[in-house]
A protein has these predicted regions:
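Single conserved hydrophobic/aromatic residue that forms the stacking wall/gate
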Residues: 1-13
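Outer membrane beta-barrel
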Residues: 15-153, 161-165, 169-177, 231, ...
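A generic structural micro-feature
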Residues: 17, 41, 72, 122, ...
Length: 328
């Protein structure tokens, strides 16, 4: 009995799991000035809260909601994961489809006040479904793939004969990470297929990224769309009152005429996002307490370059942004 007790205790120590849920979040509040038309607006852009934890050494869960996404409440993520091994896991629920790099950046680690056109307009897909992911033990290589409902995340009751699909492959070589992927969505009457390629380079204080995305619409329902983004971020330690890090950012992004692949009343696709380019310059001073706890004070200036056929609206005008971000 003593031997059994000792063996049992040893197994418990080896299999010790922290079951206490972790709560994290990000609050982004800002003022924007339209420098072209002289208008202002105040926003709570995000009030995001997440809850995650372990059920066992081989299973965990994650739930995330945004209490104020531009004034609206949204349930973003709700999934459970099973990990048969250190290299393999299966995940089911509602979450972001495994496709792209820019789109996976969350509010707590944004480098710019406004997301790129690629991350916000062209590839901003969460869906209900399941995926599998595998990372090779002896190679810096990983792959993810999943099947999803083609319906919007707010509709979990509809039946469909179609599915959406997404996949992602990444490879790391020294300081660079190369990623490519394929996604196929069917949110309305027309299926759209997307391909993506990106490279991320990190060394010392520098972080540089470039990404390209292409979207093709079945049956030539809309002209194919292209999107691209490239940016650089440079950080340095400082001692300025309570702040301890200063960083500078530069970005150039663009998108051609793009449709969300949702048909109008006449059954035809419309152009939801007009063609445009943008250059963004920014600076951020931060208080970094831990990896997940900190405060950012960010200022950005965005210069828009519109095509002749694109009308100037407040959202497409040059703007300055002052933003305060709390991360916990």
């Amino acid at each position: 009995e003593i031997l059994i007790g000792l063996v049992g205790s040893e197994m418990c120590i080896r299999d010790r799991v922290n079951y206490v849920p972790e709560i994290h979040g990000a609050l982004r509040t800002r003022i924007e000035m339209n420098t072209t038309q002289g208008e202002y607006r105040f926003q709570v852009r995000n009030a995001r809260v997440s809850l995650g934890g372990n059920i066992a050494s081989w299973a965990n869960y994650f739930v995330q909601t945004d209490l104020c996404d531009q004034g609206k409440m949204k349930i973003l993520d709700a999934w459970a994961r099973i990990k048969p091994s250190a290299q393999l896991y299966f995940q089911a629920g509602q979450f972001r489809m495994p496709f792209g790099v820019e789109t996976f950046r969350a509010p707590n680690n944004y480098l710019f006040a406004n997301r790129s056109f690629m991350g916000k307009q062209m590839c901003n897909y969460r869906a209900v479904g399941a995926k599998a992911a595998y990372t090779f033990a002896k190679l810096p290589l990983g792959i993810e793939a999943g099947l999803f409902s083609p319906n919007a995340i707010g509709d979990h009751t509809g039946w469909s004969k179609d599915v959406a699909f997404a996949s992602k492959l990444w490879y790391k070589l020294r300081n660079a990470t190369f990623t490519t992927g394929f996604s196929s969505i069917h949110p309305s009457l027309v299926r759209a297929n997307l391909v993506d390629a990106s490279v991320v380079w990190q060394a010392g204080r520098w972080h540089v990224e470039g990404e390209y995305m292409y979207e093709h619409y079945a049956h030539k329902a809309h002209k194919a769309a292209h999107s691209y983004v490239a940016f650089a971020d440079y950080t340095m330690p400082v001692r300025a009152w309570k702040f301890n890090r200063l960083s500078f950012q530069g970005r150039f992004d663009g998108i051609t005429a793009h449709s969300s692949a949702i048909a109008g009343d006449d059954g035809l696709l419309i152009t939801n996002n007009p063609a445009r380019n943008r250059a963004t310059l920014g600076a951020t001073i931060s208080y970094i307490h831990t990896k997940s706890i900190g405060l950012d004070l960010r200022v950005n200036y965005e210069k828009y370059f519109l095509h002749h056929s694109t009308a100037v609206t407040p959202d497409l005008a040059d703007k300055a942004v002052l933003e305060l971000v709390a991360r916990f």
